[in-house]
Each structure stands twice: as C-alpha cells, then as structure tokens.
From Swiss-Prot:
NCBIfam families xref list: PRK05422.1, smpB
Keyword field contains Manganese: no
Family: Belongs to the SmpB family.
Biological process (GO), any one: trans-translation
Annotated source species: Clostridium acetobutylicum (strain ATCC 824 / DSM 792 / JCM 1419 / IAM 19013 / LMG 5710 / NBRC 13948 / NRRL B-527 / VKM B-1787 / 2291 / W)
Name of this protein: SsrA-binding protein
Source species, domain of life: Bacteria
HAMAP family linked to this entry: SmpB
Length: 155
C-alpha cells in the first residue's frame, strides 16, 4: 500500500501580512471552491495580497482572494475575486468572533496550501502595526542579518 503524502505544499503566501500585522493566532481551515478554481490554485494562480476574512451570519468568508480563471475552464470559470466560504468548526468561529469584536483585531489569510490533496487556508488573527512598529521590525531584521553575516565571516 502506498504511503500518504502528509507534507504541506504551499501554493500562495501573504508575505505582506507579516509586515503589516502582528500575528496573534493561526487556524487551519478548508475553503469552498469550484473545480476550475482548484485547478487554477494548483497551477499557482492564486494571490492573497490585500485579502481578509469576515464573519457574516455565523460563517467565515475570504474576501479579495484573487484566483485567476483556469485557462481551459471556458464557461465554468467564476469571478476571480468572489467571496469564498472558509470551513471551520462552530466553536472556532465563535472564538474568532470574540477576537474580531475587539477593536483592532482582524482576520487575515496568510497561506494557501495543500494538505492530503485538499486546499487549505491558514487564517490568522492579527492586529495592525503602526508605522513605528514596522520601522522597528525592519531595524531588528537588519541587525539580525548583520549578526548572521558577521558570524558567517568569523567561521
């Protein structure tokens, strides 16, 4: 019997989210897709930049998640920016609702990946950074890079 591949294969990242937000918690959730969207995502035609999630009527939806139309999809293609339902347990949705009801918290998709041949979204509870926080993060990153460079040269 063949061994199942349980390795996560990242299809799209939202790198800007790490720059613009402090990530508090992450959740793994499924996403409701149409067949041609799955093919397009597997071809790497998804973009999470500027995407966010919102809770409406007890359901979580991903907004502004761009999935380019599948080129062989003809009439079966759907709107690239349509709202896609994210699949979570009710208790997780209630917890997320508690977070987002507080001021400053938002839900941001940070990764789109395959797990056991299913497309999953890594959803983060995030707090927006101020400009000075972003500058501090860049300074820390540069300092860390300098230290690593110095350590590498001393070997």
């Amino acid at each position: 019997m063949a061994k199942k591949n349980t390795e996560n294969n990242t299809l799209a990242d939202n790198r800007k989210a790490w720059h613009d937000y402090f990530i508090e918690e992450t959740y793994e959730c499924g996403v409701e897709l149409v067949g041609t969207e799955v093919k397009s995502i597997k071809n790497g035609k998804a973009n999470l930049k500027d995407s966010y999630a919102e809770i409406r009527n007890g359901e979580v939806f991903a907004c502004n998640m761009h999935v380019s139309p599948y080129k062989e999809g003809n009439i079966f293609n759907v709107d690239p920016l349509r709202k896609r339902r994210l699949l979570l347990h009710k208790s997780e949705i209630d917890k997320l609702l508690g977070f987002t009801s507080q001021k400053g918290y938002t839900l941001v998709p940070i990764a789109l990946y395959l797990k056991n041949r299913r497309v999953k979204v890594k959803l983060a509870v995030a707090v927006g950074k101020k400009n000075y926080d972003k500058r501090d993060a860049l300074k820390e990153k540069d300092a860390r890079r300098e230290i690593d460079r110095a350590m590498k040269n001393n070997r």
